[in-house]
Amino acid sequence: MKVLLWIGYVLSFGLLYLYLVKRAKRAALQLNNKLVESHTIPFAVRDFIAACGGRTNFVSLRTSPTQLIVSFAKPELVQIAALQKLGIKGINKSQNQYRFVLGNFVNQLKQQIENER
């Protein structure tokens, strides 16, 4: 009797295991063609502009997928500490140009800065 019970356990759990493996493989092979892009900016755009020295300090704006590349008329007006308080992930300076590592909402930020100018 115990032997039949053990055979029943092995068969039932074996079939359950095979079913779960097949289901996991099917889920792993599904293609994900959706690109997730955030449309919410986690800080006030006016605070960002103020920390960059005001609207008139912006010369040009460009974006990469996660970075905002800005050329300033007077780079000495940029307040690094104020920008870091806004939660900017990285700030790289090269001559009059700054690269702000922000995230995938950089296109929305660029549009709002251009609308404010």
Swiss-Prot record:
Compartment annotation: Membrane
Domain PTS EIIB type-1: 42-117
The keyword Plastid belongs to this UniProt entry's keyword annotation: no
Transmembrane intervals: 1-21
Gene Ontology molecular function, alphabetical: protein-N(PI)-phosphohistidine-sugar phosphotransferase activity
GO biological process: phosphoenolpyruvate-dependent sugar phosphotransferase system
Cellular component aspect of the GO annotation: membrane
Lipid bilayer topology: Single-pass membrane protein
EC number: 2.7.1.-
Domain of life (superkingdom): Bacteria
Keyword Transferase: yes
InterPro entries: Glu_permease_IIB (IPR036878), PTS_IIB_1 (IPR001996)
Keyword annotations: Membrane, Phosphoprotein, Phosphotransferase system, Transferase, Transmembrane, Transmembrane helix
Domains (record comment): The EIIB domain is phosphorylated by phospho-EIIA on a cysteinyl or histidyl residue, depending on the transported sugar. Then, it transfers the phosphoryl group to the sugar substrate concomitantly with the sugar uptake processed by the EIIC domain.
Job description of the protein: The phosphoenolpyruvate-dependent sugar phosphotransferase system (PTS), a major carbohydrate active -transport system, catalyzes the phosphorylation of incoming sugar substrates concomitant with their translocation across the cell membrane.
Name of the protein in question: Putative phosphotransferase enzyme IIB component MPN_268
Lineage, highest ranks first: Bacteria, Bacillati, Mycoplasmatota, Mycoplasmoidales, Mycoplasmoidaceae
